[in-house]
Amino acid sequence: MMLEHVLVLSAYLFSIGIYGLITSRNMVRALMCLELILNAVNINFVTFSDFFDNRQLKGDIFSIFVIAIAAAEAAIGLAIVSSIYRNRKSTRINQSNLLNN
């Protein structure tokens, strides 16, 4: 596969993630868009690692590290969303400002 095709795919995924993160009003959807952004970055890491440096696996190892961090971020984010839903009965971002009492 050519480098340009993979980079265009990654740019599309990144753009969709940014658009969804900006326009999302639901916390779960915002977390999903953030994961989409991180996956686009992982595609770039693996692509550049394969294209420019075949012998060293720095991009591959770094993408595995990003996947592990993203999994922890998703678990913590979903736990926070679950806690907010239990207290506020809503997962909408604009209704969950916990600093206003």
UniProtKB/Swiss-Prot annotation:
GO terms for molecular function: oxidoreductase activity, acting on NAD(P)H, quinone or similar compound as acceptor; quinone binding. GO terms for cellular component: chloroplast thylakoid membrane; NADH dehydrogenase complex. Its EC number is 7.1.1.-. The chain crosses the membrane at residues 2-22, 32-52, 61-81. Keywords: Chloroplast, Membrane, NAD, NADP, Plastid, Plastoquinone, Quinone, Thylakoid, Translocase, Transmembrane, Transmembrane helix, Transport. It is found in: Plastid, Chloroplast thylakoid membrane. It catalyses: a plastoquinone + NADH + (n+1) H(+)(in) = a plastoquinol + NAD(+) + n H(+)(out); a plastoquinone + NADPH + (n+1) H(+)(in) = a plastoquinol + NADP(+) + n H(+)(out). One of its GO terms (biological process) is photosynthesis, light reaction. It is a multi-pass membrane protein. Pfam families: Oxidored_q2 (PF00420). Its main location: plastid. Disulfide bonds: none annotated. NDH shuttles electrons from NAD(P)H:plastoquinone, via FMN and iron-sulfur (Fe-S) centers, to quinones in the photosynthetic chain and possibly in a chloroplast respiratory chain. The immediate electron acceptor for the enzyme in this species is believed to be plastoquinone. Couples the redox reaction to proton translocation, and thus conserves the redox energy in a proton gradient. PANTHER family: NADH-UBIQUINONE OXIDOREDUCTASE CHAIN 4L (PTHR11434:SF16), NADH-UBIQUINONE OXIDOREDUCTASE SUBUNIT ND4L (PTHR11434). HAMAP family: NDH1_NuoK (MF_01456). Belongs to the complex I subunit 4L family. NDH is composed of at least 16 different subunits, 5 of which are encoded in the nucleus. This is NAD(P)H-quinone oxidoreductase subunit 4L, chloroplastic.
